[in-house]
Amino acid sequence: MAGFGAMEKFLVEYKSAVEKKLAEYKCNTNTAIELKLVRFPEDLENDIRTFFPEYTHQLFGDDETAFGYKGLKILLYYIAGSLSTMFRVEYASKVDENFDCVEADDVEGKIRQIIPPGFCTNTNDFLSLLEKEVDFKPFGTLLHTYSVLSPTGGENFTFQIYKADMTCRGFREYHERLQTFLMWFIETASFIDVDDERWHYFLVFEKYNKDGATLFATVGYMTVYNYYVYPDKTRPRVSQMLILTPFQGQGHGAQLLETVHRYYTEFPTVLDITAEDPSKSYVKLRDFVLVKLCQDLPCFSREKLMQGFNEDMVIEAQQKFKINKQHARRVYEILRLLVTDMSDAEQYRSYRLDIKRRLISPYKKKQRDLAKMRKCLRPEELTNQMNQIEISMQHEQLEESFQELVEDYRRVIERLAQE
């Protein structure tokens, strides 16, 4: 028995040692993948230019790790405009294939699943492509030009927004490179069917000078799908929107979304613009853009706002900027908050009740449906009692929802004040 115990202890210790050794060969792919947008040769050695993915689970699993390497680096460097790519895997050491019958993950194979062929693997070839970048020009039709002041002041950076499609020469290949960023920055990203002509593409570029020549750098993009609405309308739906990390926080998302709305206003057949599974950050962005667009419309004057939400607001928002009724209501609520004196008890009460009436509508419907079902299953007294409990819970949830909404609306108003 003593011998058996010693053997068991040895096995436990051996297993622990093996697990510890294997753990040394696990790498977090969110930090192992290094992304870079290259404009100048010196950018290759400049760590300030490096940025990292937010998500890698679609290629490397829920734990977002790669096994089998120490000091793993997955280099994905892109020339800033054309997005010509250099892909290389580097590491300090790799697990021995004979080590306890384990083998390293095929990191290169996983990355090849999403990046198109034709990439470089060495620096010299990449620098040769960089020298030809002066020939790269944006695709499609120029829609909008705007400037952003340098954070240090004294210099304006110029940006342009273009609309493109797959008939533009070279755009299909460019888009294949561009869409790879989705996997790193959108949690549920997937690639679209580019052969479907209903897709529209909106691209943001920075226009800059290099050695006396004008060049362009990719900033971000949006894809929009045009759904058919019976009998003769379309409803553009925003599917994907991404501003690359080095350009975030500079207002490009707002410029892009506003430009898209203004573009579609020119088409009488467009009913309104929606979004596919919008994130919280997208909803905040949309709130800001739509309020900015609508704030000077006559139907959203202070006098009209204080009288409550009405059909004129719905019609004018739809006709002027392709905004649907639900979004027009949010615009009204934000602008109503802007003109409401919250220190005035009567104005505050009127605003609070107006918002809560809208918030409680689905609760009331749910309660009516629930009451009908329970009458078939339980005595009336018990049903009434349970309904009272639900009403109490609804009031708490309603107040919480109201306060959260007001907080979100105030952030939009603060941003408007900074414009």
UniProtKB/Swiss-Prot annotation:
Name it: Histone acetyltransferase type B catalytic subunit
Q: How is it modified after translation?
A: Phosphorylated by AMPK at Ser-190; phosphorylation increases HAT1 activity.
Q: Name one GO molecular function term.
A: histone H4 acetyltransferase activity
Q: Does the keyword Cell cycle apply?
A: no
Recorded hits in InterPro entries, A to Z, give: Acyl_CoA_acyltransferase, HAT1_C, Hat1_N, Hat1_N_sf, Hist_AcTrfase_B-typ_cat-su, Hist_AcTrfase_HAT1_C
Q: Which UniProt keywords apply?
A: Acetylation, Acyltransferase, Cytoplasm, Mitochondrion, Nucleus, Phosphoprotein, Transferase
- What gene is this protein a product of? HAT1
**Which positions carry N-acetylalanine?**
2
Q: What's the effect of swapping residue 190 to A?
A: Complete loss of activity after pulsatile shear stress
The PTM N6-acetyllysine maps to 9, 15
